Swiss-Prot record:
GO terms of molecular function: GTP binding; GTPase activity; metal ion binding
Enzyme class (EC, first level): hydrolase
Name listed for the protein in its UniProt record: tRNA modification GTPase MnmE
GO CC, alphabetical: cytosol
Domain called TrmE-type G: residue spans: 216-377
Species of the source: Salmonella paratyphi A (strain ATCC 9150 / SARB42)
Annotated keywords: Cytoplasm, GTP-binding, Hydrolase, Magnesium, Metal-binding, Nucleotide-binding, Potassium, tRNA processing
Binding of Mg(2+), residues: 230, 251
Cofactor(s) listed: K(+)
Disulfide bonds: none
Cofactor: how and how many bound: Binds 1 potassium ion per subunit.
Length: 454
């Protein structure tokens, strides 16, 4: 579709409400104002006016706001009509506007896309709009707002600028090889490169925090039947989310709870007890359990402390450990400490965290909560933090790889041309975050996930 079209969409959620807003952007927005309002409102002033139908009768009355381009969110002429929030009223007004030639319904995210294309915000800021709307916690909302205000983009742009200066220095060394000073081996380039690598590592650390805050961590509770998995889910969720009985195999399907631990979002998943089941329904539940385990960020290996004294997961259930995906983090949870009399707390066994608790009484559950938070490196207070998406992490990782490759070329062979190329590729990877180098397909995927009126 052409970006020269004038677009309209409801900017408020569907349904009944006190206020309903229609947003219009494009060349014909001025004509819409004159047709529907009978006048062009004073720029950036609220004007209380009737909204008129084709025959001049009033459809509604409310506030009209006129933002002539380029001083608007999209960079185009923008008109906002704020009327009553009834779906019938808004639908009538929308149909009235669509009778005007050259006006069409906006695609999802098209207002933000136009703002990006008109240099009103970069791609990371545009994504932050959707993240702010979807934020599931106060900290996520604050971090999304920081990204919208340019905190993440500023960090990325600083890295791009540093790489630009470094590339200039390297290119000079390549173009003037007969100078008395060997720029490639005088130590200055290596020092600057190490500085950029260190700055990039710091941004990657914050970005991982931001991604965790946005995406959440997927934690799967797994183990044999009657180990207390559902009781632990209830204890972590703070409510009776799962049915708990003494009957083995009570949980046959996957149960999900979304919780927060000091601002960190977690997707807690309770699964069917793992065993050789004869019942077809239970077998399906066990298959689903393994599917969830294979996609987990961490597994809580639930152990009934009354059935074994072993603490090493390989000794407790070697077949289970052997089937787990390689490098999948495990926390061993020895349950029923209220019965065994074990000392509550946390220790480490063969590189795995071991938590002793009672899911029934709740004793020791806070220790597990802290373990989950610390295991992901999550910081409760992230002043100035920003949200990040998986594509951001990938771009940062690619940039880091190019810088390490460039450093190897510099130290191994003093190969200036190869170093310059790696620096260029690193710069390009970083620029993908803000949208300076981004394919149209990626833009389409990003903005299509937005709300219609954003």
């Amino acid at each position: 579709m052409s970006h020269n079209d004038t677009i309209v969409a409801q900017a408020t959620p569907p349904g009944r409400g006190g206020v309903g807003i229609l947003r219009i952007s494009g060349l014909k927005a001025r004509g819409v104002a004159q047709e529907v309002l009978g006048k062009l409102p004073k720029p950036r002033y609220a004007d209380y006016l009737p909204f008129k139908d084709v025959d001049g009768s009033a459809l509604d009355q409310g506030i009209a706001l006129w933002f002539p381009g380029p001083n608007s969110f999209t960079g185009e002429d923008v008109l906002e009509l704020q009327g009553h929030g009834g779906p019938v009223i808004l639908d009538l007004l929308l149909k009235r506007i669509l009778t005007l030639p050259g006006v069409r319904i906006a695609r999802p995210g098209e207002f933000s896309e136009r703002a990006f294309l008109n240099d009103k915000l970069d791609l990371a800021q545009a994504e932050a709009i959707a993240d702010l709307i979807d934020a599931s916690s106060e900290q996520a909302a604050r971090s999304a707002l920081n990204s919208l205000q340019g905190a993440f983009s500023a960090r990325v742009n600083h890295l791009v600028e540093a790489l630009t200066h470094l590339r200039i220095y390297v290119e000079a060394a390549i173009d003037f090889p007969d100078e008395e000073i060997d720029f490639l081996s005088d130590g200055k380039i290596e020092a600057q490169l190490n500085g950029v690598i260190a700055d990039l590592d710091a941004v990657r650390t914050e970005a991982r925090q931001g991604s965790l805050l946005r995406e959440g961590m997927k934690v799967v509770i797994a183990g044999r039947p009657n180990a207390g998995k559902s009781s632990l889910l209830n204890a972590l969720a703070g409510r009776e989310a799962a049915i708990v009985t003494d009957i083995a195999g009570t949980t046959r399907d996957v149960l999900r709870e979304h919780i927060h631990i000091d601002g960190m979002p977690l997707h807690i998943i309770d699964t069917a007890g793992l065993r050789d089941a004869n019942d077809e329904v239970e077998r399906i539940g066990i298959e689903r359990a393994w599917q969830e385990i294979e996609q987990a960020d961490r597994v809580l290996f639930m152990v009934d402390g009354t059935t074994t004294d072993a603490v090493d997961p390989a000794d407790i259930w070697p077949d289970f450990i052997a089937r787990l995906p390689k490098n999948l983090p495990i926390t061993v949870v020895r349950n029923k400490a209220d019965i065994t009399g074990e000392t509550l707390g946390i220790s480490e066994v063969n590189g795995h965290s071991l938590v002793r608790l009672s899911a029934r009484t709740g004793e020791g559950v806070d220790v597990l909560r802290n373990n989950l938070k610390q295991s992901m490196g999550f910081e409760t207070n992230m002043e100035g933090g920003f949200l990040a998406r998986r594509r951001h992490l990938q771009a940062l990782a690619e940039a880091a790889n190019h810088l390490e490759q460039g450093k190897a070329q510099l130290l191994g062979a003093w190969a200036g041309e190869l170093l310059a190329e790696e620096l260029r590729l690193a710069q390009q990877s970083l620029s993908e975050i803000t949208g300076e180098f981004t394919s149209d397909d990626l833009l389409g995927r990003i903005f299509s996930s937005f709300c219609i009126g954003k």
